[in-house]
């Protein structure tokens, strides 16, 4: 396995330009049901040329290491106020401040053109490019209520409905989306990695202050996928059709409500609904779980990268 070399246009997701401009205006001005994004001088702390320059050039920032930059924020500001890249109230799983206000995922900083692998077996439930919300994104339902979403990609190699195995090559990383465009070349190319359990965003790391909490990473820490990994059979989650339809019916945006209601089969409708209500939470007053059962945290995920290219992960604030 080797690094690819996507163009800057593909890496940043700039095409088609007219549509990207329209989407950029949503982030800056807001929409009928989406408040504008919030940023200030504290947002400049997200820039780091010592990491960004080599990664944009397709090289390691730290040899054979994934750099963990922004972590899941356990003190997120109300999303009704708008997506915030400010740092006003932040706490990562270690009790430190490597995150920002609205960050509900984990950022894996890797060289542009890194092969993206499936972190566990599952079914592809969403592929979409939205310049104002994370660029090109790929979501996989791994069964038992667990979905992962990888954002800021340059290219996706699978389609919705595909069944993929742990370690399968599913995409190529870049840094697509508006934040890349406005911060180039000081913004750090990365994969924004969301984990949703029973429809809600969760931190894949176990909180240090909660020793009873289980990590979602295999072995308790983020490790790349070995070439000879044993891959389980792909399957999706067991959705309750009445619960899914109730969440969709409560959506306040008519065009989104109609699109979700038309999706078949149930697995895809459930996956699309979870994806939509997490990327656009102000559209969904009903936050109930769409799953038939409640699922506990357990170690199921690898880093979505190959052990051929990476040995492990390091924290940006410890470099």
Name each region found by the language model:
Residues 98-108, 142, 195-202:
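Small beta-barrel nucleic-acid-binding modules, principally OB-folds
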Residues 115-126, 158-173:
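Short, well-structured beta-strand-loop connectors
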Residues 64, 80-89, 150-153, 201-211:
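Short amphipathic beta-strand/extended segments with alternating polar/hydrophobic composition
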Residues 138, 162-235:
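Conserved, short, structured surface segments that act as functional micro-motifs
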Residues 109, 141, 151, 174, ...:
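Residue-level detector of conserved, well-ordered beta-strand and adjacent loop positions
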Residues 119-157, 178-190:
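Zn2+-dependent peptidoglycan hydrolase active-site motif and core
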Residues 113, 121, 129, 143-145, ...:
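Solvent-exposed coil/turn segments that connect beta secondary-structure elements
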Residues 2-135, 179, 220-319:
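Surface-exposed, glycine-biased beta-strand/turn segments
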């Amino acid at each position: 396995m080797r690094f690819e070399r996507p163009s800057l246009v593909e890496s940043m997701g700039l095409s088609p330009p007219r549509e990207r401009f329209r989407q950029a205006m949503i982030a800056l001005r807001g929409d009928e049901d989406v408040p504008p994004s919030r940023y200030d001088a504290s947002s400049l702390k997200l820039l780091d040329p010592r990491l960004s320059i080599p990664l944009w050039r397709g090289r390691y920032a730290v040899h054979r290491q994934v750099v963990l930059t922004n972590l899941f924020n356990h003190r997120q500001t109300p999303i009704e106020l708008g997506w915030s890249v400010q740092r006003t109230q932040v706490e990562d799983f270690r009790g430190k401040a490597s995150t920002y206000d609205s960050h509900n995922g984990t950022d894996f900083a890797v060289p542009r053109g890194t092969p993206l692998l499936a972190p566990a077996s599952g079914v592809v439930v969403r592929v979409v490019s939205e310049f104002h919300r994370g660029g090109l994104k790929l979501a996989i339902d791994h069964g038992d209520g667990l979905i992962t979403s990888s954002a800021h990609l340059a290219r996706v190699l699978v389609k919705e409905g595909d069944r993929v195995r742990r370690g399968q090559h599913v995409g190529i990383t870049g840094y697509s989306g508006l934040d890349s465009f406005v911060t180039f070349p000081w913004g750090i190319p990365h994969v924004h990695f969301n984990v949703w359990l029973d429809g809600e965003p969760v931190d894949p790391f176990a909180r240090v202050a909660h020793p009873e909490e289980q990590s979602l990473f295999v072995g308790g820490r983020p490790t790349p996928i070995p070439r000879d990994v044993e891959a389980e059979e792909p399957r999706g989650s067991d959705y309750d059709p009445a619960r899914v339809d109730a969440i969709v019916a409560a959506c306040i945006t008519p065009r989104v409500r109609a699109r979700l209601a038309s999706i078949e089969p149930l697995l895809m409708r459930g996956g699309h609904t979870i994806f939509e209500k997490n990327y656009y939470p102000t559209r969904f007053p009903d936050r109930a779980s769409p799953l038939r059962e409640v699922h506990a945290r357990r170690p199921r995920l690898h880093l979505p990268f190959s052990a051929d290219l990476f040995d492990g992960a390091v924290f940006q604030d410890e470099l």
